[in-house]
Amino acid sequence: MQDDIHCSLEELQTTRSSSIISTLIRIQQCGSMEGRNFSHFDTLRCLSATAVDPKKLGRPDLFLIELSRQDRDFAAISYVWGATEHEDLGNGSYRVILKSGRTRPAQVRDIVLDRVIKYIASQGISSFWIDQECINQANKRERAEAMQSMDVVYRRSRFPVGVLSVPLTRQRQVNHLQKLLTGSLAEDVGDRYGRVRLLISFSKAYEVLQTLFRIMCDPWWTRRWIFQEEYCTSTAMQLLIPMELSIKKLDIADSKVDDLVIDARLFRLQATRFCIACESIQTFRSRRSRWQCRFVLRRAKSYNMLRRYGWMINDTGRNLAMSTRILADICRRSASVQSDTLAIMANCCGYSTRLDVEQLEAAGVRSLSLALLALFIINGEILNHSLEHCVGTTIDFIKTHSFRRFSPPTCDQQLTFMKRCRLSRIHLCNEGIQTVGYIWQCRQVIQLPCMSSSECRDAGTVLARIATHLGSSSAAKLQACFEDYRKGILPQFLRTPGLEDVFDDMVGAIVQAVINGKHIFLAQLVGHQEPLAIFISETSLTLGSIIFTSFEHADDVKMEPRRRFLDKFVSLRVDRKQHVDDSLPHLEVRDWANGVWLPELSNRQSVLFPWPQSLRA
């Protein structure tokens, strides 16, 4: 597969006989929602050196063992396969002892195994998983299946470890890292705008930047597979950074190992805070220093921190879909096998529909960028209907046309909420993106009488007032829903924790809207009379506004019980366009609309979102 992610849409179009849309439709035929094969992970092969006498000279033997499905107490190792500038390339000094008693030389570089074994021994970890040794690389089928589900190993491990190779060579570099990780370089400002500020001089900030830049130049930050490995470990990843033995270890260092051991999540969070603080006040005067700061931010960004403070550096992606950011960051890195990028993206984004590389090749699809675009769309990611023509690459198109007007109903777990916001049951056709859901129209404005401050402090009281008002508005089913919710009873269609969380957040948003004196709208399914939905008066919502909603349980697709895909949920204000074929409504996305609605499966209908102009050109 060709790595054409740097080619423009125009170039992609001119190099093929068929249109981009017809290519996307053809790629769709190579998609599958069947569950991934986890048989090779049921008993996970790991390496253990615990049976070796610690007084024995030389390197220990490594025993290939098997862990049960429930065992999570192992280290999952993330490292660069290829040669690195700062490491000895020798391997084979370690012996791997198989279950049969036969032995073979280890393929992983000796220096990597030296550091890993010393680290896990210091932490009391009995075994570790490393792909080059624990997956049969000669078995193409096993390797392919493992590739599609590699994320599960890193999610499962309690002790994921990233092995970097560029060493710290000066004491002040370690000192800078200590101050960074303890939050001594930048801090949050508790004002109504939500800002960060720098706590050190410009000259000290420049020294810290050089330390961060050195760490970011490690090849560990350049691989697509490693992006997945770190991303899927969530908050558990520890980084091993080599350092000169003469450097004095500080509080952040483990005295039992030669490496500097730091928390990857904390490092990203503090590095992002520091870089935003520096960029926002133009700390660095030289063009090179400003480039280095942006370079660090691109490679070590914290998505949560960037969402909170990105406005300070003119980052416009606050309400951009998470998958768009993830895809852009993956494509900044490299992969020796370009088609691996499809599995990496699917694993990181929790996609239920995957593309079969062999089928793509058989269908004559060679374009990685169009395969990524198809994967993005067929998994329900929302595109804006825009007449704006994109002259850039496929990634530029996704950034430009990806829906960016999400409005999460609560302050907590906003990125998780946005990650669930996807369309359901996608089918691509010449006219556009076909999906299923419910079409509502706002028919009645209701505003509850003002409540006392004591009443507003009690959410239960507010819910009771809402339920009473719904009863007087001929919305009996909604009234019953809110009364049941007060008793802890959720609607039956919420069969998964993900959708229950969404419902809780939406009810909370309605309660807060009532407390704030906002209008709320009762909505009816188009063609029906009874109000079955409430939406909050936000943005441009008015009487007569059309709202499209849909949901899909993660367990509506065939999959293994240990790795759930994400529930899908959308609630969008749309424009309905007149079309000759009235049986299939044509909708155009406008805004997000928070609210609660009661679906009836019999009323779900197919709709079509037309292709953006850039793809139709």
Residue ranges and their predicted role:
Residues 80, 128, 219-220, 224, ...:
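Residues in intrinsically disordered, low-complexity segments of regulatory proteins
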Residues 4, 12-19, 149, 173, ...:
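Non-membrane alpha-helical secondary structure
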Residues 418-419, 424-617:
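Long mid-to-C-terminal assembly/interaction modules of large eukaryotic proteins
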Residues 254, 261-262, 266-484:
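Short helix/strand-capping turn motifs
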Residues 1-127, 134-145, 152, 157, ...:
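Metal-dependent phosphate/diphosphate-handling catalytic cores characterized by acidic Asp/Glu clusters
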Residues 100-106, 142-150, 155-358:
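Metal-ion-coordinating, acidic/His-rich active-site neighborhoods
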Residues 56-64, 113-114, 145-148, 211-213, ...:
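Short alpha-helical segments and helix-capping/turn motifs at coil-helix boundaries
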